[in-house]
Design a protein with these regions (language model features):
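Acidic, divalent-metal-coordinating active-site segment for phosphoryl/phosphodiester hydrolysis
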Residues: 189-196
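Conserved CoA-thioester-binding segment of acyl-CoA-metabolizing enzymes
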Residues: 1-64, 79-80
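Glycine- (often His-adjacent) and acidic-residue-rich active-site loop
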Residues: 55, 63-113, 162
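Terminal low-complexity tails and localization/encapsulation signals of metabolic enzymes
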Residues: 2-11, 272-285
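C-terminal long alpha-helix characteristic of the crotonase
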Residues: 147-152, 194, 203-253, 259-265, ...
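CoA-thioester-processing core
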Residues: 112-121, 127, 133-187, 200, ...
Length: 285
């Protein structure tokens, strides 16, 4: 019997085993899916569970309600303080050095929550509707493919809270849309609509409505899930490596990768299926 997805407070996990698609849905719609302390913990846990499920060959990351993600939850001064790692630790010795070390470790933990998207072996498709602000941009930028509805609005909002965006936007967004555009978005906190997001490469397609977005994004994830899981995993890994390394280093990496991939059963199956004019049937990863 297939394992049942775990239950979480702030996200929902579902698996369509026939399609090979796992869905991770942000589920705080009344708060516009603002990121609270529970969500920071649950997103990587949900992704880790999906990554270990052999039936899941692609992940759809989406959100309940009208908005994808409003960024960190700033609904109260106390919650904002906790989110920023400023809560006091009773009984712990304190000095500027220790406080800086604690803040460093706090930020690194938050970064790891969204880097988990990149570390997920399978492709992750992100479906964005409504507001995608602050931490929402951090999360979307970590995904492999982004599609949005016409009402989507992107905003790197941190500077308006006197914060340097530190969860991944300043590292990933320039690689997606270029250094100049990313820096302008981060310095101005200017809202970018869906059409502009498509023009600059932040989104690969724009759908008319949120319902059409969900159908299209799931269909895209299903298409990716039908590919060779070894080839899909390798393609994702090679592209991520190439992003952060030189061309020569990237070529060396993919040569080593394909030294094993070109001897896989998936290559033989894809070749047979092509000559037999049928869809290939790949084994689980």
């Amino acid at each position: 019997m297939a394992p049942r997805p775990p239950s979480f407070k702030t996200v929902v996990v579902e698996v369509d085993r026939d399609a090979g698609v796992g869905t991770l849905r942000l589920n705080r719609p009344r708060k516009s899916n603002a990121i609270d302390p529970d969500m920071w913990l649950e997103i990587p846990r949900a992704l880790a569970w999906l990554d270990e499920d052999e039936d899941v060959r692609a992940v759809l990351l989406c959100a309940a309600g009208k908005n994808f993600c409003a960024g960190i939850d700033v609904s109260s001064p106390e919650l904002l303080s906790e989110q920023l790692g400023q809560a006091t630790r009773s009984g712990a010795p304190s000095c500027a050095g220790r406080e800086a070390e604690a803040m460093y470790r706090h930020v690194r933990r938050l970064q790891e929550s969204f880097t988990a998207v990149e570390r997920c072996r399978v492709p992750v498709v992100c479906a964005i509707q409504g507001a995608c602000f602050g931490g929402g941009v951090d999360l979307a930028a970590a995904c492999d493919v982004r599609v949005c509805s016409k009402d989507a609005v992107f905003c790197v909002k941190e500077i308006d809270l006197a914060i340097v965006a530190d969860i991944g936007t300043l590292q990933r967004l320039p690689k997606l849309i270029g250094h100049g555009r990313a820096l302008e978005m981060a310095l101005t906190a200017r809202a970018v609509d869906a059409d502009e997001a498509f023009r600059v490469g932040l989104a690969t397609s724009v759908l008319e409505s949120p319902s059409e977005l969900q159908r299209n994004a799931f269909a895209l994830a299903k298409t990716l899930a039908a590919k060779s899981p070894l080839a899909a995993q390798g393609t994702k890994a090679a592209c991520l490596h190439a992003r952060d390394h030189s061309v020569n280093e990237g070529l060396e990496y993919v040569a080593n990768l394909n030294a094993s991939r070109l001897r896989s059963a998936d290559l033989a199956e894809a070749t047979r299926a092509r000559f037999e004019r049928r869809a290939p049937a790949f084994a689980k990863l």
